[in-house]
Amino acid sequence: WTDKMKKTTTILLTAGILASLVFSGCGPGGQQIKIGVAGPLTGEQGKAGQDLLHGVQLAVSECNARGGVLGKRVVIIAGDDRADEKEANAIAQRLCDQGVAGVVGHYNSHCSIAGSRIYNQRMIPQITPSSTNPKFTQQGFDNVFRTCGRDDQQGRIAADYAFNVMKVKKVAIFSDGTTYGLGLAEEFKKSILLNNKPKKVEVTIVAEAQIPVITEGKAPDYGPLLDPLISYQPDLIYFGGSYPEGAMLIRQVKERRLAAAFMSGDAIANSELIKRGGVATEGIYFTFGPAVEDMPQAGRFYDSFKARYGELGPYSVYAYDAATVLLKSIELAGTTSGDSLVKVIHSAKFAGAMGELEFDGNGDIKAAPYVLWTVKGGEFGPVKAEVQVQ
């Protein structure tokens, strides 16, 4: 942290689970309002979790510079769920016990879904900036929201591009076996097979499998799954999963000199993908939201974030807006009561860095544009005009 950040934002962070924390004046009527942040702050996905945390830090520091909320200073309590469902449960329970007004998180869909049951029992607003699995907002919980889109949306965009632009005929589909990865791969498969019927063009799934994830830094060998593709010769390999495994899969695909194009979803959108995958990542495709630089309202956020943290994380603006919604809802409600905050979030419109934010009855963001991206010259860039999905 810079000295400036130390002065404007208080972060209480532990690895794994939150230890017992003692605050002065943090109970009812105290001078602090606590906001929880949960994600994989260490480990293979640590970069993604830190990107999320930085977005919340910026929103909170700006809020405190304006005098806080309801005349009180906002404090962040951050928990490292290590991308593990059991840790997510522990973090959720500890955040609730510490009396947070709301939570920004988690990063992974399986962690967000696991934690949501606990947050719902306490009616604490939970806003995920990155969990795209549709099931998260289909549980019948009033208190869950997301500032990102869903896998059924990005799966359809990816499939439409693969079918109509790339003209693929043979596809291999892999996932990392997580709730997110399996769900995204299934949505892509469903969408691309649906394209067969009206166009009367046959798309064949030549292979479908789960790949082992990286554990304790050990690199899995994907050879037994990839070697059969040499004879199948797919036009496209689609992967549902995150950037650590994605980078390794891409490298091993290139090592076998397979001519297939490679496509994935939002969770590989991290600079670590290019660092780990190297030149093998050149020309790969993935779905994500529009570039922050192209968002008319995001200029101030972009400049402030770059000045404080340097590199802009892919989900930092989504976390920033999630925190913005949470803080503004406290201001509008005039209280930190969960029931009141949930009602406000469902009914109000919020001005975020990404533009106007409004949620539907399930807690999904009403406008969720996706763009197809690629890697060119070692950098991410959109390859297609923005596509609005309803």
Pin down the residues of each PLM region:
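Short, low-complexity disordered leader/linker segments with a strong preference
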Residues: 1-34, 65, 97, 388-390
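Beta-alpha junction/loop-to-helix N-cap segments that form part of ligand/metal-binding clefts
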Residues: 27-32, 47-52, 62, 66-141, ...
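Loop/turn elements at helix/coil->beta-strand transitions in domains of secreted/extracellular proteins
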Residues: 33, 71-74, 98-102, 121-126, ...
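Extracytoplasmic "Venus flytrap"
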Residues: 36-57, 79-86, 107-110, 177-182, ...
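Extracellular/periplasmic Venus flytrap/periplasmic-binding protein
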Residues: 90, 134-135, 142-255, 290-300
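Periplasmic-binding protein-like
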Residues: 95-107, 127-129, 170-175, 232-242, ...
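Extracellular/periplasmic periplasmic-binding protein-like sensory domains
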Residues: 232, 250-320, 334, 376-389
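Segments of small-molecule ligand-sensing domains
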Residues: 305-316, 327-382
